[in-house]
């Protein structure tokens, strides 16, 4: 992406007793099915794939999409999500079951699976991997930033604070059984377990942190070939003793680290890369030259540009305690005044999609245009404003809104278009710009803003991941200080519902309540901007921007 977006989460604790629940899941492969591609495929070969320099490829720090892409090939977590079937399936776990209270999960592991060093993957491997993330003594240089994934596991607080030596909520009755006890009901917990950061680690990860950090030993379909050469390259080769399905079709992957998107795309055009991101200003030309994927996610010969929806959103937060923005009607008017399509077309040349709600396409439970006032309707906005904030002789309404944002990437252009739309209706606007790090660490946490921009990327493909962290009272990511007792109760009720369909239906009810309050203004959803070379016979990139490269085939 061309701008920084938040993907660190803190799940605020809370929960109710769940109804009876039991679930089993069959083992499955990551990603989608690419078997339908036509043409002959070459045996093996090495895929040349562009990434920026990642922050980490070790599960200890897997949080941004560049490192996640590498880690996804090296490690297999307990579960994975099949987007082509909208179904969570087992990966390192062949099945799981849940107690009646939905606060204890028993995962049954694939037996005899191996790490890349030949040692056996056991339940202890998961326990020590999770404890390695939380234990403040794991690294002398920095604590892991991703412990929030385990915040609901019993014993999280004690271990992360250095007051305990183990995560007491995780036990290992035998080598092939992992039992996880939560501190509250959360029926969606198996979705949390799909994150690559929660993969198992072998004993060597505990023996030498620095060595493992640059050359991780995992249980995935590919293994390291040498170590990560910081700023230059990461090489992987097929792991022939892979235990969770078919072996990779590729011989290996060369992750070619480039400094920026434009440089990488130039390398792609020169024939030096097989997969690269397309700069926004060149996407239309790329589609014309290379052809567009039929489903947006699967690249095949002659249809090589991926433009599918991603599980992410760009939105405006509103400080609901602000003297002006505490007025719900004004918040609705501000949303109605914004021409989202113009932003998508002008700033992003159609590579974004106007957001009709906070939950993006690709999430089970998504409803198109669910937030009725997340649309462009100047007349409706003007009607609200005329009734409550009539304009004076100069067309001014005695309203002023300051927008907080960073100047990186395209944010200035987006915010200027938003302010122009508001100004056209007699609202005085101004900018409050700062460095992104300062905004995230000071401005937003202290609620020192009226309105501000933010991006949100899904950790897990569930509605809860877009509703609970952003809108529950007191939530660490609820920067606008929104609070609605009915929303809080609905979210907690939903978390404890056993049935997937009933749980999603409850989240949809809560989503409607939030839409009525309009505590944030959805602006647009993100889309893929990737291209594959003609060497690639078939490649599938899911809505989370992850690709199971064990299924990738090169053309003969």
Feature-to-residue mapping (PLM):
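Structural transition elements
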Residues: 30, 353-388, 407-413
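Surface-exposed binding/hinge segments that line
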Residues: 125-127, 134, 141-202
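Long beta-strand-rich cores associated with HINT superfamily self-processing modules
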Residues: 530-556
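Gly/Pro-rich hinge or "lid" segments in bacterial periplasmic/extracellular proteins
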Residues: 82-83, 175, 181-248, 252
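Ligand-site clamp/hinge motif
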Residues: 205-210, 241-290, 419, 428
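N-terminal lobe/hinge region of extracytoplasmic solute-binding protein
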Residues: 50-100, 217, 546
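Alpha-helical secondary-structure segments
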Residues: 122-129, 175-181, 221, 250-252, ...
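Extracytoplasmic/peripheral linker and loop segments enriched in polar/acidic and small residues
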Residues: 11-12, 344, 430-440, 465-534, ...
């Amino acid at each position: 992406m061309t701008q920084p977006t938040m993907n660190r989460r803190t799940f605020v604790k809370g929960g109710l007793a769940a109804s009876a629940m039991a679930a089993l899941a069959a083992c499955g492969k990551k990603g989608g099915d690419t078997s339908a591609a036509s043409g002959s495929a070459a045996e093996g070969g090495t895929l040349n794939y562009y990434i920026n320099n990642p922050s980490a490829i070790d599960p200890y720090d897997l949080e941004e999409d560049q490192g996640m892409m590498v880690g996804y090939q090296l490690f297999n977590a307990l579960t994975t999500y099949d987007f082509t079937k909208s179904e969570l399936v087992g990966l390192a776990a062949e099945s799981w079951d849940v107690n009646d209270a939905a606060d204890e999960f028993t995962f049954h592991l694939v037996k005899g699976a191996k790490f890349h060093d030949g040692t056996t993957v056991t339940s202890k491997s998961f326990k020590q991997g999770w404890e390695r993330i939380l234990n403040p003594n794991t690294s002398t240089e920095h604590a892991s930033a991703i412990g929030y994934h385990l915040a609901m596991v019993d014993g999280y607080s004690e271990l992360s604070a250095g007051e305990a030596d183990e995560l007491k909520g995780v036990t290992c009755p035998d080598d092939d059984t992992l039992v996880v006890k939560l501190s509250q009901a959360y029926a969606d917990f198996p979705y949390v377990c799909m994150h690559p950061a929660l993969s198992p680690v072998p004993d060597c990860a505990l023996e030498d942190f620095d060595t493992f950090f640059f050359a991780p030993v995992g249980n995935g379909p590919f293994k390291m070939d040498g170590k990560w050469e910081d700023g230059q390259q990461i090489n992987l080769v097929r792991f022939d003793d892979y235990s969770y399905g078919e072996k990779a079709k590729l011989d290996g992957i060369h992750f070619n680290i480039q400094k920026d998107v434009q440089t990488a795309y130039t390398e792609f055009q020169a024939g030096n890369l097989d997969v690269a991101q397309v700069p926004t200003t060149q996407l239309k030309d790329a589609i014309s030259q290379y052809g567009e994927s039929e489903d947006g996610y699967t690249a095949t010969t002659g249809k090589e540009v991926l433009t599918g929806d991603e599980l992410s959103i760009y939105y405006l937060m509103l400080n609901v305690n602000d003297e002006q923005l505490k007025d719900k009607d004004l918040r609705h008017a501000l949303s109605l005044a914004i021409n989202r399509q113009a932003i998508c077309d002008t700033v992003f040349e159609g590579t974004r999609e106007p957001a009709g709600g906070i939950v993006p396409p690709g999430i089970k439970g998504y409803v198109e245009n669910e937030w009725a006032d997340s649309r462009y309707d100047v007349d409706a906005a003007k009607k609200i404003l005329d009734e409550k904030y009539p304009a004076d002789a100069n067309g001014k309404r005695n309203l002023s809104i300051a927008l907080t944002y960073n100047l990186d990437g395209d944010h200035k252009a987006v915010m200027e278009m938003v302010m122009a739309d508001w100004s056209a209706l007699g609202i005085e606007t101004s900018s409050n710009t700062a460095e992104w790090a300062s905004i995230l660490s000071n401005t937003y946490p202290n609620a020192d803003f009226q309105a501000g921009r933010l991006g949100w990327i899904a950790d897990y493909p569930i509605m809860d991941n877009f509703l609970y962290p952003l809108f529950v009272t007191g939530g660490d990511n609820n920067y606008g200080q929104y609070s609605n007792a009915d929303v809080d109760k609905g979210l907690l009720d939903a978390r404890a519902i056993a049935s997937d369909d009933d749980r999603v239906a409850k989240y949809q009810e809560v989503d409607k309540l939030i839409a009525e309050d309009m505590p944030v203004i959805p602006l647009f959803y993100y889309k893929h901007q990737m291209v594959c070379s003609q060497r690639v016979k078939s490649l599938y990139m899911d809505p989370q921007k992850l690709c199971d490269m064990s299924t990738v085939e090169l053309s003969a």
